[in-house]
Regions:
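Hydrophobic alpha-helical transmembrane segments of ABC transporter permease domains
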Residues: 53, 65, 118, 155-199, ...
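Transmembrane helix-loop-helix hairpins at lipid-water interfaces of multipass membrane proteins
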Residues: 48-106, 187-194, 294, 303-307
Length: 622
């Protein structure tokens, strides 16, 4: 077995100590950063306790090393060279053991704990549990934030929690242990030396107390501006087609530059605060080292301490000077991580506005009866979109929602899916208030094809089977054939050479045309075979020949199912059982196509304005 494989096998044993997939989904994550950090630390308390011990040992070994060095110098001064090993070999062996065995064992153990046990698994544990909470947020949550910004908070939050704990338990605890032992050793040599270090520590603590809060404030602002800037970058790249079509690259320059400038200004305030702290620490350290050197030399000149004691004292304070510099950097990192965690909790620790009710039922396959009972709804604090809306859809009935843009058609569908909760009234599915049904089993009853197909950057196979995981290859292909997608799927390839059903479609399906994306979405709905179908301009991106062929399959698919169709092209829904005409969130007409045309109302006006199947929006003056 090669050395590399042996090393891999030895280290891999430590990587499974922390289970990153622990299920704590029922817990409510704390909103305050410190409580948030402790919540996750408790899930890996064993490794963190060992890290605390290792950090203390590291500080103790460092202090013992300098003390031993001073003792060794005194030993050399008092011993004839030819008698050194004969008389003092146990002491020399002990010193070598301390330097090469004990210190190495502590450092290697700390490295294994940090890099093999904690970093990969614990960081992933935080990110996984954060993702589990965020993915349960309602649709409105994602409408109010950048997707890239949310993803950044999950990634950075996981790293910040881990780094914060490691920093405290290993680096800072080791530093504090070293200070206490240094103070103890120096007091034993000369109390004045201990007084100098004690005063130095008070000054160091004062810098942390009075100067670091500015770093904390600047760090929090920097984290906010970093997230905003990252969100602007993702927004520009996600909508690159719009950027190209409107030739708005220079406008995006200004938009992104503004975000970068705000981040740069926040970062500059942070670095100014850091520079001030570093200057103060360097002045304090210089004063400490000068005072210790002067007192140690004076004490030696008076016969109070030995040469070895001077070496030990100076070695300890030089090490303290070295540690305090990078310790201030670590404390700064600690504050940055705390600010990052606090920023992340504002997203990750938000209790979902829509949750399953206690004791919510899991609905099996529904009959498809929907009842909107005096429903009122508005987005946020805005104007009511739906007001006192009532509609009964019988099982197996095919209904179309018709009306001008902004009438509330898509909102009605979103309320049925419980993407939003009604403000007043209720919605019943098979006699059950949808708020009393688990969200998962509620949405399992619906097959949806929207005007803008929702595809993942995964394989075509995965996208078709998204609503029915575990579907066989034959079932996936059959659904694709019914959606008239099989032929073009076979010709699709991606930059990594994957072809056909294995090809990845790009972010939001960007590698496919609008018609191809819509056919894959229809195939997904066909495969899911839900009892209620929602068709929101389901064939709007298709050419006439393909649309006609798919309409035949959709007609067959609709048999025995409840259908809610939304269409601006009235010709696509004229044959449905009942047309519901909506205007400003209210039902103004309902009936068959023939009945509504004969009535001469709003539907008849819309029908007359059709030109090539397109429904023009009503003029504001009408």
């Amino acid at each position: 077995m090669s050395e590399g494989r042996l090393q891999e096998r030895l280290l891999r044993r430590f990587e499974g100590v922390i289970d990153p997939w622990q299920d704590t989904e029922q817990d409510v994550l704390p909103r305050e950063a410190w409580a948030f950090i402790l919540y996750f630390a408790r899930q890996a308390k064993g490794p963190f306790l060992l890290l605390l011990i290792a950090g203390g040992l590291a500080g103790a070994v460092d202090a013992a090393l300098y003390w031993s060095l001073g003792w060794l110098i005194d030993l050399l001064e008092s011993t004839e060279p030819e008698r050194l090993f004969a008389d003092h070999w146990p002491v020399i062996a002990g010193f070598i053991l301390l330097v090469f065995v004990v210190r190495s064992a502590v450092m290697i153990g700390s490295a294994i704990l940090e890099q093999q046990v904690i970093v990969p698994s614990f960081f992933s544990l935080v990110r996984w549990q954060a993702f589990r909470r965020v993915i349960e947020q309602p649709y409105a949550f994602y409408q109010n934030d950048f997707a890239g910004r949310i993803a950044t908070k999950i990634m950075q939050g996981g790293e910040a929690v881990g780094d914060f704990i490691i920093n405290i338990l290993q680096t800072i605890w080791s530093f504090l242990t070293f200070i206490v032992l240094t103070l103890t050793i120096l007091v034993s040599l000369d109390p004045l030396l201990g007084v100098v270090v004690a005063l130095w520590f008070l000054g160091y603590a004062a810098i942390i107390r009075f100067l670091l809060p500015e770093i904390r404030r600047a760090g929090r602002e920097t984290a906010d501006q970093r997230s905003i800037f990252n969100g602007r970058l993702v927004d520009a790249f996600t909508n690159i087609m719009a950027v190209k079509l409107f030739d708005s690259g220079r406008r995006e320059h200004a938009y992104v530059r503004e975000g970068l400038a705000n981040f740069l200004a926040a970062a500059a305030r942070l670095t100014r605060a850091i520079t001030s702290v570093r200057a103060a620490v360097n002045l304090l350290n210089g004063a400490m080292m000068g005072a210790v050197a002067a007192i140690a030399l004076w004490s030696w000149s008076q016969g109070g301490i030995s040469t070895g004691a001077i070496a030990a004292a100076m070695g300890l304070v030089f090490r303290l000077n070295q540690m305090s510099g990078w310790m201030m950097f670590n404390i700064n990192g600690l504050i940055r991580n705390y600010a990052t965690v606090q920023d992340a909790t504002r997203t990750i620790s938000v209790r979902p506005a829509i949750q399953d009710a206690p004791g919510a039922i899991t609905l099996a396959r529904a009959r498809g009866e929907l009842l909107f009972d005096n429903v009122t709804f508005r987005y946020g604090e805005g104007q009511k979109v739906i007001e006192n809306f009532s509609l009964h859809i019988r099982p197996g009935e095919r209904v179309a929602l018709v009306g001008p843009s902004g009438a509330g058609k898509t909102t009605i569908v979103n309320l049925a899916l419980r993407l939003f909760d009604v403000e007043q009234g209720r919605i019943l599915l098979d006699g059950h208030d949808i708020r009393s049904i688990t969200q998962a089993s509620l949405r399992a009853q619906f097959g949806v094809v929207s005007q803008e197909p929702m595809l993942m950057h995964r394989s075509i196979r995965d996208n078709i089977a998204y609503g029915r995981p575990g579907a066989s290859e034959e079932e996936i292909i059959a659904a694709a054939r019914r959606a008239r997608a099989h032929e073009f799927i076979l010709s699709v390839s991606d930059p990594r050479g994957r072809r056909g059903y294995d090809a990845h479609v790009g972010e939001r399906g960007v590698k496919l045309s609008g018609g191809q994306r819509q056919r894959i979405a229809i195939a997904r709905m066909i495969l899911k075979d839900a009892p209620i179908l929602i068709l929101d301009e389901a064939t709007s991106a298709l050419d006439s020949d393909v649309e006609a062929a798919i309409q035949e399959n959709l007609a067959a698919l609709m048999q025995g199912k409840t259908v809610i169709a939304i269409a601006h092209r009235l010709s696509t829904i004229a044959a449905l059982d009942r047309l519901i005409v909506i205007d400003e969130g209210r039902i103004v007409e309902e009936g068959t196509h023939a009945e509504l045309v004969a009535a001469g109302g709003l539907y008849a006006q819309l029908w007359k304005r059709q030109s090539g199947g397109f429904l023009a929006e009503r003029l504001a003056a009408e």
